[in-house]
Swiss-Prot record:
Belongs to the class-III pyridoxal-phosphate-dependent aminotransferase family. SUPFAM superfamilies: PLP-dependent transferases. This is Isoleucine 2-epimerase. Optimum pH is 5.0 for the forward reaction, and 6.0 for the reverse reaction. Keywords: Isomerase, Pyridoxal phosphate. Its EC number is 5.1.1.21. It catalyses: L-isoleucine = D-allo-isoleucine. Optimum temperature is 50 degrees Celsius for the forward reaction, and 45 degrees Celsius for the reverse reaction. Pfam families: Aminotran_3. Homotetramer. Its cofactor is pyridoxal 5'-phosphate. It comes from Lentilactobacillus buchneri (Lactobacillus buchneri). The keyword ATP-binding does not apply.
Amino acid sequence: MGKLDKASKLIDEENKYYARSARINYYNLVIDHAHGATLVDVDGNKYIDLLASASAINVGHTHEKVVKAIADQAQKLIHYTPAYFHHVPGMELSEKLAKIAPGNSPKMVSFGNSGSDANDAIIKFARAYTGRQYIVSYMGSYHGSTYGSQTLSGSSLNMTRKIGPMLPSVVHVPYPDSYRTYPGETEHDVSLRYFNEFKKPFESFLPADETACVLIEPIQGDGGIIKAPEEYMQLVYKFCHEHGILFAIDEVNQGLGRTGKMWAIQQFKDIEPDLMSVGKSLASGMPLSAVIGKKEVMQSLDAPAHLFTTAGNPVCSAASLATLDVIEYEGLVEKSATDGAYAKQRFLEMQQRHPMIGDVRMWGLNGGIELVKDPKTKEPDSDAATKVIYYAFAHGVVIITLAGNILRFQPPLVIPREQLDQALQVLDDAFTAVENGEVTIPKDTGKIGW
């Protein structure tokens, strides 16, 4: 990789004006342009993107069909608020999303500007429909940065520090972890243990008949790409139905083909959510989100209970329609499944040679590669993970960490196999270099990652 002179100067200048609360620190990358799975920075350096803008660019950067849809719509109508009137792209998109949502029940849609407000919407609609106040969410979850979604989240102290009190009546329970288990535990044992933890609040202080919904990520994204066991998910789903509690899912990070299924919930058998949030890749990174819910639930609120001036913007809606077409007609769900299986095998092979790789979790092109100090104790190794991503960056690969010690592997779904192989080789080399003590982190970098 070449020098970062221009990038470093620009960042030094930006730091005078840009609040540190709005960016997690990794390394000095100032992106100038991008296409497919390739990034080019302001100094002319090229990188293979293994992050896809936090899983917001599933169809790849500047996909021709998405760019054309944006340009064509911008020539006709950039914006008129859907809060009062109508436009065709929004009409078409609401119908499309209602029809492709998981399950056979009639669905309705409400648009927003980010996954954060889509999760706020889940709080609103769940409380309105049930007439109940309590919401159950999960430790390790990330649902956004509006006040409601930030309260729902459980992944960072900085999301509650100095800004409380948070939204009342939100209860967090542990998310099942099939990697760190007790000796001799089977997946069945793990499911039952965590389901018992799930039930404890209901047995002590949380009235089930006053609980509006349970919100869960079928696969936790920022928590480390962790999938709940099938049996656990079915037990929670059944519990919700037995107690009149809505079952809601967050598909913002994991939806739209990321997991090798259109929706992450389709990794499980016969589960139909009452409410779901989508965003990020919905419009290829353009500011658009949606809450999709069963018709009767979505009819529980009247305007202006959940509307935004720019939500469902015509340009964003056109971008989303084009994005959904690309996912369908280019077979990206199937490609994600195939390439993800290939990448998983490559990482498992690396694990045999690199004991720092404690766990390889992969569903589609969607992986959490957990680095540990010892495969027996499973003690997290954040130092090694930081060195791996710095080595990767220096050798033309963009990847970041989750929870300090987990590599976040989420490339654009369009990544060619050749680029995927190149990136995987760089990571393999990075593990070797770190093991040999050949990687150091600059002293002035500050705190890295979450």
